[in-house]
Structure formats: structure tokens, C-alpha cells
A protein has these predicted regions:
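N-terminal intrinsically disordered, cationic/polar leader segments
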Residues: 2-27, 31-147
Length: 147
């Protein structure tokens, strides 16, 4: 299983198989963009993001002591909100601040007929959590979802 976005200049995402679980990975010119793309990959692991309308906005505040833990907190918060609100999101905006981030996600209530759900994440696995910056300054953020 591999599902990828077209690689754009400022960001891209992919969904990949990780044993019986699914991994999501975001790439960007900034950590914020990589986190946005990883969240978009989370949506793509569940449904076609293009089928999700941007009717409602949900705001997030996340804090952690490292980039990897911040990614886990961020993706975990998105998973929790998707579940609690029975929503899918198709657009994300992340802004870093000190040891955390603020974010917005745009989406709509779940419509199982139109959204054609494929997988449902219950959380983040301990393995596979990584946030890194390469020598050219590009960021990658990845985690493995418990399915």
C-alpha cells in the first residue's frame, strides 16, 4: 500500500503500509508544512480528501517537549476530534510557537456514502515516530497509526 500526493515545491504527503498498521508521512519546506501534510495523509488514509468539503473549522492547541512528541500530540488530537465530532478534514493550517503549535482544520461531518471510508485510526503507535530536517532544510514528519 502506498498512496502519495504529487510532489509540490512546498509540500507532499504519503500513506504507507507498516505491518498491519498504516503510516503517514508529510514533507515540507518548514516543520509546519510537514505537519500539515502528515495530517492530510491521515485524512487520505481514511477517505478521499478531495471528497471532503471545508464547511467547518476546528481549532487545536498542542504542546510537547520535542518535535516528535509534538507530531504525536498533533496527529493524536486530529484523530480524537475526527472521532468525537464524526468529521473528516481536508485542509490544515499549522503555526509553530515555542514548544507547541496552534492549528486549524477545515472539514465537514462524516458522510459514509460519499466519503467511502477505508480505515479508522485509533491512535499513534510507538514505533515509526520521526520528525527530521535534511541537509537542504526540507522537513519530514511521520508516524504510524494504530488501525
Amino acid at each position: 500500500m502506498a498512496n502519495k500526493s504529487p510532489h509540490h515545491k512546498d509540500g507532499a504527503w504519503e500513506v504507507f503500509a507498516h505491518g498491519t498498521d498504516i503510516g503517514v508521512r508529510g514533507f515540507g519546506l518548514s516543520r509546519d508544512r510537514a505537519f500539515e501534510e502528515a495530517a492530510y495523509a491521515l485524512t487520505a488514509a481514511r477517505a478521499d480528501p478531495e471528497s471532503v468539503r471545508q464547511h467547518d473549522i476546528v481549532e487545536f492547541v498542542c504542546n510537547a517537549t520535542s518535535d516528535a512528541l509534538l507530531l504525536r500530540e498533533w496527529i493524536g488530537a486530529v484523530i480524537r476530534e475526527m472521532s468525537a465530532r464524526q468529521m473528516l478534514f481536508s485542509r490544515y493550517a499549522v503555526t509553530s510557537r515555542n514548544h507547541g503549535l496552534t492549528a486549524r482544520a477545515w472539514g465537514e461531518p462524516l458522510d459514509e456514502d460519499r466519503h467511502r471510508l477505508t480505515a479508522r485510526a485509533s491512535g499513534i503507535a510507538e514505533a515509526g515516530l520521526e520528525v527530521a530536517r535534511d541537509t537542504e532544510g526540507n522537513w519530514m514528519a511521520q508516524c504510524v497509526l494504530d488501525i
